């Protein structure tokens, strides 16, 4: 692994490492109306989430709770209930959930098959080749996350 990792590579290492830990249940609610798919996720307090890569531009809303969000451009913001935003294609977020959080995304589509929707709307980076457990542990410590946090990817 190179001595100096890019921000994206650091997220890849972290995602790979978190994938080795026990996963947290983050229930989903899927709603379909004519021409619109709404996906709502519940994320419990204390969870570290790394999203899939979004393929489409779409609105999102924080319905309840509060989270610190790191974006690939290096920006870090705290969002809370009532926050509305637009996700751009290529976006991949890392969230630390400060309070139990409900987050919804809205997608114009007539597709209702969930497996097809996941492939249509998102992709996942290939992180299976990483062997950066030691560096990932150092990243977790620098982020102030416990040695074996509850996590989901």
Model-based region annotation:
Residues 1-40, 121, 132-153:
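A short, N-terminal "cap"/entry segment at the start of jelly-roll beta-barrel domains
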Residues 33, 40, 72-93:
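Short acidic-glycine-tyrosine-enriched beta hairpin
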Residues 34-55:
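Conserved short histidine dyad/triad with adjacent acidic residue
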Residues 49-54, 71, 77, 95-96:
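Short histidine-centered beta-strand/loop micro-motifs
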Residues 54-73:
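Glycine- and acidic-residue-biased ligand/ion/polar-headgroup-sensing regions
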Residues 88-117:
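Ligand-binding loop in jelly-roll beta-barrel domains
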Residues 110-130:
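C-terminal output/interaction extensions
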